[in-house]
Amino acid sequence: GVSSNSKDIGKDYIFVAIKGENFDGSNYIEEAKKNGALLALAEGIEDKNVFTLKEGSSRLIYSLLLGCFYEKQPKQIIGVTGTNGKTSVVEFCRQIWAQAGWRSASMGTLGTKIETTTKIDTYHKSKNNLTTYEPSDLHKELDNLFSHHVSHVAIEASSHGIDQYRLDGVRLSGAVFTNLSHDHLDYHK
């Protein structure tokens, strides 16, 4: 397995230490090792027992590793980004695809919804109420959708989610850009 949460680490897992606004994952490397981590990855620390990234982002590496670990994904995945309209567009896509006879899903603010021509099933909501799920939740969810024979998925791709590499490792077949306004410009300096 792969995780950025030391509490979720099991035997022979890869632990990726991510530095966030409030926590530094490198402070949890020892706990991850005690829990069975085979390998720990971190940015900018000097420790001969840790694989240190000299360049690049631990967030990016984490998402790419998850994409390899959860390799099964639906055939058609589109990302929808923009200041406004992401939720509406992913919902419209899911509904249109279902009417065309494809088993479809949407992921984002409203949770994960699977739709067939006969019913809608909402079965997951992001633990953190994020528009774009954290990479571990996103990749597990895509793997789960594949196992439920979903062929088409529309994902809300927030600007924060894109910037934080949450969608890396997802094999997107298309993208939609809705619009751009001044929201979030404080984040994207």
Segment roles from a protein language model:
Residues I61-K189:
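Phosphate-binding loop of NTP-binding sites
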Residues G1-L64, C68:
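N-terminal leader/targeting and accessory segments in enzymes
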